[in-house]
């Protein structure tokens, strides 16, 4: 019984990469074709796989309820928080996590650095959704250009670069960097920012900050189910 389950799991994992035929699956698993075919027919009965027009098997809609159950249990705040601490400790910048709520964005998590700023952000602080570095990310992925002060070329550049840096945008003596956090289906889930004194955001330091933010932002996204 256990061996059959292990064989079935192996076949499903192979199908994650795309459709495969019985012979291809048999070769990849070193299983007899009859065994592979029997397992596929069992999966097909549960709508976990389907036989497509190219005469190959692919994952089907039956796997979605299982995935959805897992994905709905994911808490971006809980997943991001330890990485936010790591970013704060490495870069000595305050780290913030924002969610979109209608016409606003709200800070749902913050890890503060020992660099107090005027108008410092607190958990629960609400801002207009399209303002600031985080707002530009939300505007790029969620906004109608008619509702933002962003151009189509700016949005295109942000999608290409994967980050935003602003200096003195919301607070005159502060600067910020924002990166998107994606979830299942590569849907924008949240925006993570760092913020600090504007003097910290020299060209050299921005490169250092960007390397860390992009790497850990993508790590959080992958744990949220994104396929980047």
What are these model-predicted stretches?
Residues 1-74, 218, 222, 226:
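N-terminal helix-turn-helix
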Residues 90, 145-161, 172-173, 190-228:
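Juxtadomain coupling helices with adjacent low-complexity linkers
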